[in-house]
Swiss-Prot record:
Record family assignment: Belongs to the TrpB family.
GO molecular function: tryptophan synthase activity
EC code(s) of this entry: 4.2.1.20
Disulphide linkage map: none
Native organism: Streptococcus pneumoniae (strain P1031)
Keyword Ribonucleoprotein: no
Domain of life: Bacteria
UniProt name for this protein: Tryptophan synthase beta chain
GO CC annotation, single: cytoplasm
Binding partners and assembly: Tetramer of two alpha and two beta chains.
Listed NCBIfam families: trpB
Xref: InterPro entries: Trp_synth_b_CS (IPR006653), Trp_synth_beta (IPR006654), Trp_synth_beta/beta-like (IPR023026), TrpB-like_PALP (IPR001926), TrpB-like_PALP_sf (IPR036052)
Job description of the protein: The beta subunit is responsible for the synthesis of L-tryptophan from indole and L-serine.
Alphabetized UniProt keyword annotations: Amino-acid biosynthesis, Aromatic amino acid biosynthesis, Lyase, Pyridoxal phosphate, Tryptophan biosynthesis
C-alpha cells in the first residue's frame, strides 16, 4: 500500500484540512511555505539531527523488557525509550524542530499550549536554547495537577498563563493559544504540541516525531535479525507519539498498530477521553477529526487520570487510520493504567508516565493474546516523575476506601 497522505489541501482521506478564520489563513500558509523550504534544505535537517543527537540524547534505546515479557509469559515486549530524552518525553522531538523552524522564519516569540506540562517544558527548553521569548498557555486545572512542570517552565524563562475559560484543561489552553497567535501573527510562532490543528501542523508534528518509528524499525532489525515486529502499541491523546511510531510502519501491512485511548472511569460513563471509541467526525481547532460531542455538536468534556490524554479530539491522521482500518484504537481505563504504572515500575525498574501506562496496560493483554512466538514495540512516551505524587495520592485514597468497605 503506497501511503501519501496528506494531499495538497492537508486532508488524510476525509479528515484534516484547514478550517481557520481568514486572520489565521495567512499564518498557516506562511508556515507551510517555510516548512516546504526547510524540507528542501539539507542544512535544516543536518542542524536538527545534530541537536537531536547532542542536545536531546538521541537515538533513544529500544529495550527488550525481558522481565515484563517473562512475567506475562506472552509475546516479546520491546520498549522504545522516549522517556530517556532530555526533558523526559517525546515532546522535545517536535518542540526543537518547530522552534528551529520559527527561528529560520525570523520569528521572535514562541507560544504553545500544554496539558500535562511535558510539551510546555519541551517548548520552554527549546526556546531557551534558541534565545526566544516564550509564553505557555495551560488550563488552570492542569496548572494545579502539574505544579512541578509549571515551575520548570518558569525556571526555563517561560511565562505560564493559566487559562480560566471552559473546564480549564487542554482544549481551553489550545483556544487561548490560537487567540494569542491571531493577535500577534507577525512576530510569533505557535507550536502545537500534538499532531492536530489546521494543516500543515499535523504533518509537521508527524514528520518531527517520525524519528521514533524510524529508529525503532532499524533497532528492531539490528537487535533481532528479523525484519519487522508483529505489533506496535502507543497511547493516544492528540496522538503525536503514536503517529511518530506508526508512520514509518504504515506501509508494512503485516504490522498491527494499536493506539490506546483514555477510557477514564469507563467508556459508558461521561468520564473518559475515548474519542475513536465514542466520538464522531467534527471540526475542532481547525481540523476535521473524530471528536467527543453531544447530539447538538457541542464538544464534550474529556476526562482522564492523565493530563496529557484528556483531549476531546484526536489527530486527523489517526482518524484516517481508524477509518481505513489500518490501526485499531482501544480504550484503557484509569484503573488499568494505574496497574500498568505499578507493574512496569516493579518488574523493570522503569517508572512510566501515566500516559504511557495506558499503552503498557494494553500491551500486557495483547502479549497474552499473541503468544511467545510474536513480538511488539511499545512506545514508552515519557517518564513518570511528574505523576508520582498524583499516583501516591490516588493509591492511598483507594486503599482508604477499601479499608472503609471492610470496616
Amino acid at each position: 500500500m503506497a501511503y501519501q497522505e496528506p494531499n495538497k489541501d492537508g486532508f488524510y482521506g476525509k479528515f484534516g484540512g484547514r478550517f481557520v478564520p481568514e486572520t489565521l489563513m495567512t499564518a498557516v500558509l506562511e508556515l507551510e511555505k517555510a516548512y516546504r523550504e526547510s524540507q528542501a534544505d539539507p542544512s535544516f535537517q543536518e542542524e536538527l539531527n545534530q541537536l537531536l543527537r547532542q542536545y536531546v540524547g538521541r537515538e533513544t534505546p529500544l529495550y527488550y523488557a525481558k522481565n515484563l515479557t517473562q512475567h506475562i509469559g506472552g509475546a516479546k515486549i520491546y520498549l522504545k525509550r522516549e522517556d530517556l530524552n532530555h526533558t523526559g518525553a517525546h515532546k522535545i522531538n517536535n518542540a526543537l524542530g518547530q522552534v528551529w523552524l520559527a527561528k529560520r522564519m525570523g520569528k521572535k516569540k514562541i507560544i504553545a499550549e500544554t496539558g500535562a506540562g511535558q510539551h510546555g517544558v519541551a517548548t520552554a527548553t527549546a526556546a531557551a536554547l534558541f534565545n526566544m521569548e516564550c509564553t505557555i498557555y495551560m488550563g488552570e486545572e492542569d496548572v494545579k495537577r502539574q505544579a512541578l512542570n509549571v515551575f520548570r517552565m518558569e525556571l526555563l524563562g517561560a511565562k505560564v498563563e493559566a487559562v480560566t475559560d471552559g473546564s480549564r484543561v487542554l482544549k481551553d489552553a489550545v483556544n487561548a493559544a490560537l487567540r494569542s497567535w491571531v493577535a500577534n501573527i507577525d512576530d510569533t510562532h505557535y507550536i502545537l504540541g500534538s499532531a492536530l490543528g489546521p494543516h500543515p501542523f499535523p504533518e509537521i508534528v508527524r514528520d518531527f516525531q517520525s524519528v521514533i518509528g524510524r529508529e525503532a524499525k532499524q533497532q528492531y532489525r539490528d537487535m533481532t535479525g528479523q525484519d519487522l515486529p508483529d505489533a506496535l502499541v502507543a497511547c493516544v491523546g492528540g496522538g503525536s507519539n503514536a503517529i511518530g511510531l506508526f508512520h514509518p510502519f504504515v506501509e508494512d501491512e503485516s504490522v498491527a498498530m494499536y493506539g490506546t485511548e483514555a477510557a477514564g472511569l469507563g467508556v459508558d460513563t461521561e468520564h473518559h477521553a475515548a474519542t475513536l471509541t465514542k466520538g464522531r467526525p467534527g471540526v475542532l481547532h481547525g481540523s476535521l477529526m473524530d471528536v467527543l460531542q453531544d447530539a447538538h455538536g457541542q464538544i464534550l468534556e474529556a476526562f482522564s487520570i492523565s493530563a496529557g490524554l484528556d483531549y476531546p479530539g484526536i489527530g486527523p491522521e489517526h482518524s484516517h487510520y481508524h477509518d481505513i482500518k489500518r490501526a485499531s484504537y482501544v480504550p484503557v481505563t484509569d484503573e488499568e493504567a494505574l496497574e500498568g504504572f505499578q507493574l512496569l515500575s516493579r518488574v523493570e525498574g522503569i517508572i512510566p508516565a501515566l500516559e504511557s501506562s495506558h499503552a503498557i496496560a494494553f500491551a500486557v493483554k495483547l502479549a497474552k493474546e499473541l503468544g511467545p512466538e510474536k513480538s511488539m514495540i511499545v512506545c514508552l512516551s515519557g517518564r513518570g516523575d511528574k505523576d508520582v505524587v498524583q499516583v501516591k495520592d490516588r493509591l492511598e485514597a483507594d486503599a482508604a476506601k477499601k479499608g472503609e468497605a471492610h470496616a
